[in-house]
Amino acid sequence: MNHLLVADTFDPFLLEEATISTALTVPIDGHINKDFYPAEERGEDCIPWELQSFSKIKGLCFDLIKGKHTPLYFKFVLHMQPDKAAAMLTKAQVDPDIIRALVLTIRYDGEKTVLTTGCAYQTFTMDKSADTAWDKALKKYLDLKGISYEEL
């Protein structure tokens, strides 16, 4: 839980959605409401993505989870930042234009945490090289951060 909500491990990701279930169940939509901001703060320089950076929302998530009881459940759906996803796919010799998002779902069921990768494609394809590259890159990242895992 420290890697998820305290350390900077998942800061390079964007939050699509989260659900946290403790005494209450709280859904969080990670899509940014650009109308909330004045016109001069809505440009791509100020708000570069449609989704909120996980680093800006993890404090709220931590506040919802902290306490003397462990949460009953939580789920975070994260996207790799588009520029980082494109660089990783290009390095793996995969056309980044075929991918809408590289997705990481982190789900805790009260006993164990499961990380699931996925690729959101622009269109249907039988080629799964992007999935393979994303799986490989995430395993390398988890190893680099010292996070142990078991492949299912």
List where the protein language model places each region:
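Mixed-charge, glycine-accented linear interaction segment located at domain edges/termini
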Residues: 113-152
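Charge-rich, low-complexity N-terminal segments
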Residues: 1-54
